[in-house]
């Protein structure tokens, strides 16, 4: 009977755990939808920015403009902005980011370049602090759905480091959101800005859908519609001054997009992890139920045998 009670208690505990994991899965799904809405909300600004850059590009050659954020210089120190998460229970999301970061640091060091880490997310901060890595700045406890203000804060500090020549190049390492079950860490260059990319805002947007009772993600290519400026358009300011003022906005927009995509990747990883945990809990409950029935059947059989043996003894 003690064995039966132990199995019953374990079944109860697993059922309670399954309720928690299922609730966490649904919460993560709701937050993925919010991340999707945020991405859609930033599209008009990104499109308009691309149009302005396109119009400026028709008035001057961006490759020939001498602006600090476009200036290439010999690379001695690279600032690597790494976007990870603050919490666990999201599968291999944080581990994959950390692994790719270590690989990128080795690649840069093998070419004789020094690396300064700018870390977003408590998991990355804790990992690299334990290993005495060269950390320039840390950012923890950001919003679960990143905001423009948070992106601007990070962007301003990266700009200051680049313009003061503390770093000669800035790279961004974040997790690109592919689907609910697939994501991959990618590295892209942030600073100096590439003039050839300023007037093209090609990217993708994602939508969380429900099909057949299951969550699924649909991605679609988005190409900003740009048009040539009217021939009689007059710039009240020097186009170079306008460009110089807009470049930080472009950088912050790139950062915000990356932070949003990384947040969606983390939430999708948490959804998948909690879904797997719920499935495993259901399977364990089924296995424990069989064990309970067998133990109960054995106990009943034993009692019958004892009754029969007692009757024969009389």
Swiss-Prot record:
Its main location: membrane. Gene3D superfamilies: 3.40.1380.10, ATP synthase, gamma subunit, helix hairpin domain. Keywords: ATP synthesis, CF(1), Hydrogen ion transport, Ion transport, Membrane, Thylakoid, Transport. GO terms for molecular function: ATP binding; proton-transporting ATP synthase activity, rotational mechanism. Transmembrane segments: none annotated. It is found in: Cellular thylakoid membrane. It is a peripheral membrane protein. GO terms for cellular component: plasma membrane-derived thylakoid membrane; proton-transporting ATP synthase complex. PANTHER family: ATP SYNTHASE GAMMA CHAIN, ATP SYNTHASE GAMMA CHAIN, CHLOROPLASTIC. F-type ATPases have 2 components, CF(1) - the catalytic core - and CF(0) - the membrane proton channel. CF(1) has five subunits: alpha(3), beta(3), gamma(1), delta(1), epsilon(1). CF(0) has three main subunits: a, b and c. Produces ATP from ADP in the presence of a proton gradient across the membrane. The gamma chain is believed to be important in regulating ATPase activity and the flow of protons through the CF(0) complex. Belongs to the ATPase gamma chain family. This is ATP synthase gamma chain. It comes from Synechococcus sp. (strain JA-2-3B'a(2-13)) (Cyanobacteria bacterium Yellowstone B-Prime). The gene is atpG.
């Amino acid at each position: 009977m003690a064995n039966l009670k132990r199995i019953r208690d374990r079944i109860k505990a697993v059922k309670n755990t399954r309720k928690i994991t299922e609730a966490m899965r649904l919460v993560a799904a709701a937050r993925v939808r919010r991340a999707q809405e945020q991405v859609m909300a930033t599209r008009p600004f990104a499109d308009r920015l691309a149009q302005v850059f396109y119009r400026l590009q028709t008035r001057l050659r961006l490759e020939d403009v001498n602006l600090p954020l476009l200036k290439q210089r010999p690379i001695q120190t690279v600032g690597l902005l790494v976007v990870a998460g603050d919490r666990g229970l999201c599968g291999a999301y944080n581990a994959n980011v950390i692994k790719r970061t270590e690989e990128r640091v080795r690649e840069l060091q093998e070419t004789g370049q020094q690396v300064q880490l700018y870390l977003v997310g408590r998991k990355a901060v804790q990992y690299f602090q334990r290993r005495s890595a060269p950390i320039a700045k840390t950012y923890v406890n950001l919003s679960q759905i990143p905001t423009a203000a948070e992106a601007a804060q990070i962007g301003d500090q990266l700009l200051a480091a680049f313009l003061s020549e503390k770093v000669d190049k800035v790279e961004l390492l974040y997790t690109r959101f592919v689907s609910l079950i697939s994501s991959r860490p990618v590295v892209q260059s942030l600073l100096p800005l590439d003039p050839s990319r300023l007037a093209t805002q090609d990217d993708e947007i994602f939508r969380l859908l429900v099909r057949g009772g299951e969550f699924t993600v649909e991605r679609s290519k988005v190409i900003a519609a740009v048009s040539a400026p009217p021939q009689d358009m007059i710039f009240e300011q020097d186009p170079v001054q306008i460009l110089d003022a807009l470049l930080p906005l472009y950088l912050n927009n790139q950062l915000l997009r990356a932070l949003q995509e990384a947040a969606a990747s983390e939430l999708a990883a948490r959804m998948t992890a909690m879904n797997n945990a719920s499935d495993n809990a259901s399977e364990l409950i089924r296995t424990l139920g069989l064990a309970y029935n067998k133990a109960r059947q054995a106990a009943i059989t034993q009692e019958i045998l004892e009754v029969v043996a007692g009757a024969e003894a009389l």
